[in-house]
Design a protein with these regions (language model features):
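Glycine-rich, acidic
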Residues: 1-94, 98
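Glycine-rich, small/acidic residue-mixed loop/short-helix segments
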Residues: 66-170
Length: 170
């Protein structure tokens, strides 16, 4: 399955057997997989992988205030379709630049709620989800901006460790 929260290949195991021992299966799989480098991980690794893959989480990254164009999903709107719920609103929606983008910071990890500032000091938005990417070797995050913007520019990120420069990416 690649439909999970992280976008990685994985498996889901279901059993109708009431006597099924999930712990026993878990220990067996870890033991047999250890020779191939299989290790257990926690939710934070899946969270970071989700951010790297750009998989959005409703309630964390997006909510009802966003339209499909602001989050990069405008290509999924079929304006030629005769009728569907919300059609009129979407047809009349001005296509704007994105309000939900990615950000990278080479100096520190990012956390939900870190504030974003423009050069002049005005608040530009906040980090909706963040972490450190061991694969990319820098801080990564999804950001919610106060207004639609293009990509490839710098913002200041105010974190618990101080203020750092971050590059806005798609």
């Amino acid at each position: 399955s690649r439909s999970g929260w992280s976008g990685e290949r994985g498996f889901e195991i279901y059993s109708k057997d009431r006597n099924f021992d999930g712990v026993e299966l878990w220990e067996y799989l870890l033991e047999k997989g250890s020779t191939a480098g299989l290790i257990a991980s926690d939710i934070s690794s899946m969270h970071t992988r989700r951010i790297e893959a750009g998989i959005l989480d409703y309630g964390t990254d997006i909510d009802q205030t966003f339209n499909p164009y602001e989050i990069g999903l405008g290509r999924l709107v079929d304006k030629e379709k005769e009728d569907f719920i919300g059609r009129e609103a979407l047809v009349n929606t001005k296509r704007t630049a994105l309000r939900l983008l990615g950000i990278k910071c080479e100096k520190t990890f990012l956390t939900r709620g870190d504030k974003l500032f423009e050069g002049a000091g005005s608040e530009a938005g906040f980090v909706s989800a963040g972490g450190w990417s061991p694969y990319l070797k820098y801080g990564v995050g999804l950001i919610r901006l106060n207004e639609s913007r293009p990509t490839n520019y710098q913002l200041r990120i105010s974190t618990s460790a101080g203020e750092f420069e971050g590059e806005v990416v798609q």
